Amino acid sequence: MSAPRNVSPPRNESALLSPCPKAAALALLGGASLLTLVIAATPSCAEGTAAATLSELSIEGAAASSLTVPSVAAQRAAVNATVGSVAFVDAKDFQDRYANTLRDTLKDVPGVYVQERYGQELRLSVRGSGISRGFHLRGLELLQDGIPLNLADGSGDFYQVDPLGLRSIEVYKGGNALTFGATTLGGAINVVTPTAQTAFAPNILRIDGGAFNTIRENVQVSRISGPVDFLVNGTITNSDGYRDHETQRTQNFNANLGYQLAPGVETRFYAGVYLTDQKLPGTLSLFNALNNPTLANPSAIAGNQSRKVETERIANRTSFPLDVGKLDIDTWAIHKSLYHPIFQVIDQDGWTYGIAPHWAGTFEVAGYRNDLILGLRAFAGQNSAFQFVNVAGQRGAQTLRAVQSASNYEAYGENRFWFLPDVALMAGAKAFSSNRTYSNKGGFSGANAFPASANETYAGINPKVGLLWQPLPDLQVFGDITGSRDVPDFSDLVQQNTLNTTFVLLRAQRAVTYEAGTRGRIDRLSWDVTLYRSEIRDELINFSINPGLNIPAATFNAPRTRHQGVEAAIALDLARDLIGTGDAVVVSQIWTHNDFHFLADPVFGDNQIAGIPRDVLRTVLTYRNREGFHVSPSVDWVPQGAFADHANSLRVPGYALLNVQAGYDFQNGVSVFVDARNLTDARYVSDISVVTDARTVAGGPVAFYPGVGRSIFGGIRAGF
């Protein structure tokens, strides 16, 4: 029986599917020498770079792949075969912009809310995951090449993700991430690094620069030799930042080595080193955020607050084709060292390690096609957590010595049964058991004088069922019901203030999500639209104790809440062959509607959950011709800002940002671009450290991250 037909990518993927590449390697990145090499790229390289100069109106054909890493076309097809809301982003859609953070790569994906705080620190939320957390990541699994980046307790941050080291991004919203074993409310985002087979070119040199004394250098080299292939990518970024005390220094190194052990058997090793030194500007009052946005919080300066992270990661995937399907076995280990002077000096060092076999195959059942995925995941980790009095960013007297341990055991499966040629019934489930153990070793004055320990085990089953109807090759309609569980991480469980540290037993967040949607293309019109509703019990809700001092938020279980919304992206080819043969004008509209609120809460009633605005819109108009010129003006519009408190007594203003991107791709493999943002220098609030009731804070909460003002960046890239 023939395979079910997957939705073909639209001609202009940036208009729809993009909504919906240790120190030894880094030493290669000398700034002046890199710029010289970029400019020196010659036309003799043109033949080898033809694939890197892509017309937006070309449909990408089959690209090279390997057993461990499918081609980009196959990655897209696998994502689009999902019964549920997903998105695929090809790196070519953001390589001609200043892509420093995940916002720069995901801002065209409906349903994904990404807002900058400072440097690479973001609020990243899908369908309200971790909605009111004012730092890092919760409720969403972040993977690289299908292998988790999150720590064993489920927490994560964004500093390991280098946009210049990526080939594609896969977004699986909510329970649709079951293909990885992820069943959190937000789902999973899988960033895929290039291999020698999928890289744009064997050699890539790039330098970006611009506002706030920003300069970034990137180099990538890849080769194939018989059964061996390798790729090395390194990026150095230096920037003073928009605000005072926001200096950013990062060094990212990614590499992979593939080897064909035997015909049809392949292993691939991944290695990464990620060094971050980020000064923290802190939050401001609403007045200062809107009128003096470049200021730093005085407490941030007095405490020389910063975040210094050294992370090393090694992983392996070994793939075996079987008589039916393919077996992948993933193993990984992550070492992370954190030095983080904020209200106190947070000094942590820990390891996360895991193994995950995964089988996927297609076979017939009574003459009907059946697609089956089965997987196991076992991962654990331990983190030494010390705290000290913060003396201008240096360790003072020690106040805490603790050990945080987490373990997780999971089994999952998903089946698609094609009972009609164009209709599939999907069913799946995940069973899990997760333990969190905290041991305070004591020995200090005050609340941490005596040893104390606590642990909690969370277990459950998350089911999933749905239907996929594909009446045409370029049209899908789907509906599904999924269950999710979010287990608290140690930032939730270990709550602290200036006086003590306490382990708080919290319940796991449970949700049932209903969604229905459609995606496809008919002639010049492309779309991806999903409606969803999540009924949530015991949602993990955060509020900041004192955001001005950068004290981590407290967490509680809200008895009942509801998240519902619309995720929509629509693109229309307005004109073709407008000025010359092969050029096109495309308009795209992305709309994310967020309705997140308490349900008969004993304290907050039916109030909106603070932290995320109700509507987020983005409009992009793109012109591109066959000679390589492209220009894209865009508007980011938030009609009404988010509430700053769960009492709904304070709301930040809405805003609109005008941006323009332009560039030229030369035939010799050299590309140049300009990325101009917030051209009107609008003053706005980008993110909030949510409080319970702003009316009770004397002088008003110091809880606001100002948005970045007018900024212009440019870059030059050579692929040969």
Give residue ranges: language-model regions:
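Transmembrane beta-barrel wall of Gram-negative outer-membrane proteins
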Residues: 202, 209-238, 243-281, 306-315, ...
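Structural signature of Gram-negative outer-membrane beta-barrels, strongest in the C-terminal barrel
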Residues: 365-379, 402-535, 622, 626
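C-terminal beta-signal and adjacent terminal beta-strands/loops
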Residues: 537, 575, 585, 637-642, ...
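Face-selective signature of the C-terminal outer-membrane beta-barrel domain
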Residues: 266-272, 305-445, 468, 528, ...
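Short acidic/polar hinge/loop motifs at secondary-structure boundaries
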Residues: 147-173
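Gram-negative outer-membrane beta-barrel transporters
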Residues: 425, 433, 526, 531-535, ...
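Membrane-embedded beta-barrel scaffold of Gram-negative outer-membrane proteins
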Residues: 317-321, 326-339, 470, 476-482, ...
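Extracytoplasmic beta-strand/coil segments of soluble accessory domains associated
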Residues: 75-76, 83-86, 103-147
